[in-house]
A protein has these predicted regions:
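Amphipathic/hydrophobic helical signal segments and adjacent flexible N-terminal regions
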Residues: 1-64, 134-164
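Beta-sheet ligand-binding and adhesion/scaffold domains
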Residues: 76-164
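Central antiparallel beta-sheet cores of small beta-barrel/beta-sandwich binding domains
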Residues: 28-114
Length: 164
């Protein structure tokens, strides 16, 4: 079986998601906020899951990050210059809403992150929470609210490449 069959919940995330990332320090004070557009793709090849994150800050700064992932053992796996980790569906979630993810920053073994992703039953919205932990202590929390723009990531990717 392949990634879509083994991870049907993750497969429901395929598409283009627009949202907002809000970061809080350990004391709960907001320290950053920016908008996002994520392209979540399932493709053939060495990296059957590939996510591209486009970030935009209110001051005009932008950033694009690529996250190609391998697939094995009913998980997607990242190992690149930024992160090393994996994501899996929570089998005990009888509503099939929850994906978990953990990773470490490459070159910073003291910092690791756990993410919980909740997909709404209608598949149109999702919320994600990150807990950044350094040396066993909470450093940052990130709250992400997203809505599905379209499942047709190929069309949006082509429009973005054409400057549209």
């Amino acid at each position: 079986m392949g990634i879509r069959e083994d991870m049907p919940l993750l497969a429901r995330h395929e598409g283009v998601w627009d949202g907002t990332y809000t970061y809080y320090n350990a004391e709960g004070v907001q320290v950053d906020q920016h908008s996002s557009r994520l392209l979540c793709r399932f493709v053939e090849g060495e990296h059957p899951y590939h996510q591209t994150n486009h970030y935009t800050w209110p001051d005009g700064r932008t950033e694009i990050r690529e996250f190609p992932a391998a697939y094995r053992d009913k998980r997607v796996w990242w190992d690149n210059e930024l992160i090393k980790g994996s994501a899996w569906e929570v089998g005990q979630d009888d509503k099939a809403r929850t994906v978990m993810l953990t990773w470490e920053r490459t070159g910073d073994p003291e910092l690791y992150l756990y993410e919980m992703i909740q997909l709404a039953d209608d598949g149109q919205t999702r919320c994600r929470t990150w807990h950044w932990i350094r040396s066993g202590k909470l450093e940052t929390r990130t709250a992400i609210e997203e809505r599905l723009v379209t499942c047709d990531w190929r069309k949006v990717e082509a429009e973005m490449a054409a400057g549209g």
